[in-house]
């Protein structure tokens, strides 16, 4: 009696492994970029949460930094997320201001890798900063103090080229 063998040959299995390897070579870097972009977007959400505090600061006449000072009414002008920390800086933003006190927006500095999940931040953005300038209408635009690579900056705040 002859027995028939069934199954895949070695060459067929090697071809499948090679195809999977080629697909992985393209997919893994794209996935890492996707993760970094999604983590960078959290910073803008943190900055959005600071808009009320910025408005309170401007009612008091100036942008106030992150240090809490109950005597002046400053209550910790920062917000910590999972992947980063957003801080209102002492710098006002108004390119048309003629004198101090004419500010209509503050600057927010987001530092990635200073959140509650420091060890889970993508190495592509860890330690990078995104500076946001608040405009008159309350929206944000990218500031000059940004060292976050352009491909990770959310489109909503990206500086027009």
Swiss-Prot record:
Keywords: Disulfide bond, Fimbrium, Membrane, Methylation, Transmembrane, Transmembrane helix. InterPro entries: N_methyl_site (IPR012902), Pilin (IPR001082), Pilin-like (IPR045584). One of its GO terms (biological process) is cell adhesion. The chain crosses the membrane at residues 8-28. PROSITE patterns: PROKAR_NTER_METHYL (PS00409). The keyword Acetylation does not apply. It is found in: Fimbrium; Membrane. It is a single-pass membrane protein. It comes from the Bacteria. Gene3D superfamilies: Glycoprotein, Type 4 Pilin (3.30.700.10). Pfam families: N_methyl, Pilin. The modification N-methylphenylalanine is found at residue 8. Belongs to the N-Me-Phe pilin family. Major component of the type IV fimbriae that plays an essential role in twitching motility, natural transformation, and protease secretion. The pili are polar flexible filaments of about 5.4 nanometers diameter and 2.5 micrometers average length; they consist of only a single polypeptide chain arranged in a helical configuration of five subunits per turn in the assembled pilus. This is Type IV major fimbrial protein FimA. The gene is fimA.
């Amino acid at each position: 009696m002859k027995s028939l063998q069934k199954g895949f040959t070695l060459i067929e299995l090697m071809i499948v492994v090679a195809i999977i390897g080629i697909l992985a070579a393209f997919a893994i870097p794209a996935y890492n970029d996707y993760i970094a972009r999604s983590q960078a977007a959290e910073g803008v959400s943190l900055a959005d949460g600071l808009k009320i505090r910025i408005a309170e600061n401007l009612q008091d006449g100036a942008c106030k930094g992150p240090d809490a000072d109950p005597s002046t009414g400053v209550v910790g002008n920062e917000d910590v997320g999972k992947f980063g920390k957003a801080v209102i800086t002492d710098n006002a933003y108004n390119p048309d201001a003629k004198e101090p006190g004419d500010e209509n927006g503050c600057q927010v500095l987001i530092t990635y890798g200073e959140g509650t999940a420091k060890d889970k931040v993508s190495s592509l953005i860890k330690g990078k900063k995104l500076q946001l300038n608040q405009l008159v209408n309350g929206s944000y635009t990218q500031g000059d103090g940004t060292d976050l690579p352009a491909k990770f900056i959310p489109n909503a705040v990206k500086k027009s080229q």
